[in-house]
Amino acid sequence: MDFEANEDLNGVRFSWNVFPSSKTDANKNVVPVGCLYTPLKEIEDLQIASYNPVVCAGPQCKAILNPYCAIDPRSSSWTCPICNSRNHLPPQYANMTQENMPIELQQTTVEYITNKPVQIPPIFFFVVDITAEQENLDALKESIITSLSLLPPNALIGFMTYGNVVQLYDLSCDIIERCSVFRGDREYQFDQLVEMLTGQKPSNTMAPLANGKITPLSLNRFFLPLEQVEFKLNQLLESMSPDQWSVPAGHRPLRATGSALNIATLLLQGCYKNVASRIILFASGPGTVAPGLIVNTELKDPIRSHHDIDSDRAPHYKKACKFYNSIAERVAENGHTVDVFAGCYDQVGMSEMKKMTDSTGGVLLLTDAFSTAIFKQSYLRLFSKDEEGYLTMVFNGNLAVKTSKDLKLQGLIGHASAVKKTDATNVSDSEIGIGSTSVWKMSALSPHHTYGIFFEIANPNAVSPITTDRANLAYTQFITQYQHASGTNRVRVTTVANQMLPFGTPAIAASFDQEAAAVLMARIAVFKAETDDGADVIRWLDRTLIKLCQKYADYNKDDPASFRLAPNFSLYPQFTYYLRRSQFLSVFNNSPDETAFYRHIFTREDTTNSLIMIQPTLTSFSMEEDPQPVLLDSISVKPNTILLLDTFFFILIYHGEQIAQWRKAGYQDDPQYADFKALLEEPKVEAAELLVDRFPLPRFIDTEAGGSQARFLLSKLNPSDNYQDMARGGSTIVLTDDVSLQNFMAHLQQVTVSGQP
């Protein structure tokens, strides 16, 4: 099966492409039935229809006309494959012929531009931490000013700064700088905020807010079209200076991050609820003022570590999580998005704030400073545009998953929040990820966003196979509604059909997509790791791997040497091995903020990028051979080669000992050694190609044998040769107590053939 072809066509990859016919049989497969779906995947020759979709009249269905529908031209009707109900075709389909079929009956993925225009343009609310040092703040100002030129002229702009206090700017005033100042140590309620800014009770202000008109007393005066306020905003940004509040020696600055976010989200709730909005937070350090306090101001109090959190010795952690989680729920319900950009060496509290971005489709980016290329380029890539000049980001997304009676939905893992629906009949009682619903809300979406969706086979017990093809197919339809940057409302519809067969049928094993399965299981593991002990999660991964091998490996009992896996299962164990060692589950060397950042990126990427994060790619360059992929293993490190490591988060070029000596001797500058110069350039060219479209921009590392940054490569390698094997010799010795892949596989084979559970 060509799994990637289906992904290119529909943006979908299933763990099993042929489903077992019963729930009992599906449980025997160990790896759940699930898929990775990219709603806005850039599909070649995507068909776009400039009319509203035809919707099934079934009260609990509402599926959309698709190629799997049975069409009866004589009665001008169609039968829905999801609910089997009969529907009338609209009059415009009356002249339909086999040669003149509408695109929705030909293509499994179609995008509709509906006739309902967007009333209010998108809103961008900049929230800037001014406790940064002057150099860092200047770099940030430059990036924000540049980003304004990338926004639509009619976009509504809001601006807020914070340090010890929160300052909300009224951009409607051209003559003087007018702003409202709020205490940073106070958690304002919605009614209080509205009354302070309008002089009226909320019940009196809601009516004028709804019509969108801007008056001197309305809350929406704080959000004005970019074309109207760009000059004023540029003046504000250029005159912005670090917070003047004095910082005693041995203390951190007073930083009211929590209060600023609370006010920003309440303000948008008051005037633009369910309107496309992004709150873009730029943080230069941790919040040191309650609400949302991350760490005390005294530097002698260290910021919490994973060990502190696990041992319940992080005094502010739970309270801060509760505060930011409440903001996350409010923001998601209001259809708004929060982005968090950190520009400092210290942690800023991403671990506490992550739900605000994860539940709304926002960006979480961890960088050392706003002056770094990683921040500058990643931030500007947020505003990337398509071929027609529109922003690739979209707003107010909503994903509904329709299934035929054979399937139920267990849940979704990705950057979304649940839309609670009580009338859905295809919802399972058992949850994986965000469950108990068939509809999820994504306040913001991009072509990068990919969601893991998990299914349960509805039939409880095995059934005898039915001979008709139609009865043996399970249908799934993904309906994504969103607001396009062009000002149109759109609906993208993807419909797929999967064959259902009894357990043990060879076609089920042949349909296993080990790459998609590894990523889906990794998403479950990462989701579990948020609440469960890390060791328990790794034990769960090991048990599922053993059970899968016991079901699908070919072996003789108690004979490890006889162990064999089919080609489409053979890589799955090593994916699990590298996942166990990855920063997603092994958090020993990472801060809580780093872990939050890594997991955030992992749960939004597609199969290919996720696999790079799990098992980085390693390419070897040498004078003797063309560039070629090599094992992620210490045996691949040789004196006469250059290695290119891609972990997704960083790209590293490693020069072997001999290559490094030649480079230091300057051989590349001698025309006689043009081949050597070309060899040095090859990995740089390939690295540059990897950097072009990636978001966020990876860190670039250039190192050599014995260099201090060579540790970034060695930490990712399978330690075939470690200090315990020094007597054997080897290319490079890796100083680690980690189990090697060879020992891991030997133990897996031993346990599998022994029949142990």
UniProtKB/Swiss-Prot annotation:
Cite the PANTHER family for this sequence.
PROTEIN TRANSPORT PROTEIN SEC23
**Annotated residues for binding of Zn(2+):** C56, C61, C80, C83
Q: Major place of localization?
A: cytoplasm
Coiled-coil stretches: none
Give TM regions.
Answer: none
Name the protein family: Belongs to the SEC23/SEC24 family. SEC23 subfamily.
Can you name this protein? Protein transport protein SEC23-2
- Which GO terms of the molecular function aspect are on file? GTPase activator activity; zinc ion binding
CDD domains on file: Sec23_C
Keyword set, alphabetical order: Cytoplasm, Cytoplasmic vesicle, Endoplasmic reticulum, ER-Golgi transport, Golgi apparatus, Membrane, Metal-binding, Protein transport, Transport, Zinc
Q: Name one GO biological process term.
A: COPII-coated vesicle cargo loading
SUPFAM superfamilies given in the database record = beta-sandwich domain of Sec23/24 (SSF81995), C-terminal, gelsolin-like domain of Sec23/24 (SSF82754), Helical domain of Sec23/24 (SSF81811), vWA-like (SSF53300), Zn-finger domain of Sec23/24 (SSF82919)
Its assembly, as annotated, is: The COPII coat is composed of at least 5 proteins: the SEC23/24 complex, the SEC13/31 complex, and the protein SAR1.
Write one Pfam family the protein is assigned to.
Answer: Sec23_helical
Q: Does the keyword Transport apply?
A: yes
Query: Which topology term describes how it sits in the membrane?
Result: Peripheral membrane protein
One Gene Ontology cellular component term attached to this UniProt record is:
Golgi membrane
Q: State the encoding gene.
A: SEC232
Functional description taken from the UniProt entry: Component of the coat protein complex II (COPII) which promotes the formation of transport vesicles from the endoplasmic reticulum (ER). The coat has two main functions, the physical deformation of the endoplasmic reticulum membrane into vesicles and the selection of cargo molecules.
Q: Where in the cell is it found?
A: Cytoplasm; Cytoplasmic vesicle, COPII-coated vesicle membrane; Endoplasmic reticulum membrane; Golgi apparatus membrane
